[in-house]
Amino acid sequence: MAINELRAIANFAKAAELGSLRQAAAAQGITPQASSQLLVQLESHLGVRLFHRTTRSLSLTEEGRQFL
């Protein structure tokens, strides 16, 4: 497993815990854009959506709950 994949999984877990990509980014010392990009890369790698996203909320999909 590549380091970037580990970062993407850690980012996913932190976003799921906090319910926010912005807060997950702050907790990891990265930008919100980097957090979002890691999530997109992980979803692309897995071939599933892990979160339902709106401008104000983030919630796990069924696939996201299973992956967690």
Language-model regions: role of each:
Residues 8-15, 67:
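Short alpha-helical "packing" element that flanks the helix-turn-helix/winged-helix DNA-binding module
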Residues 43-60:
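A short LG(V/I)-centered, amphipathic sequence patch enriched
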Residues 13-29:
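Short helix-boundary/capping micro-motifs
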Residues 62-68:
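Short, cationic-aromatic polyanion-contact patches
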Residues 2-7:
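Short helix-coil-helix linker/hinge
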Residues 26-27, 44, 65:
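Alpha-helical residues within the helix-turn-helix
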Residues 31-34, 38-41:
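Residues within the DNA-recognition helix of helix-turn-helix
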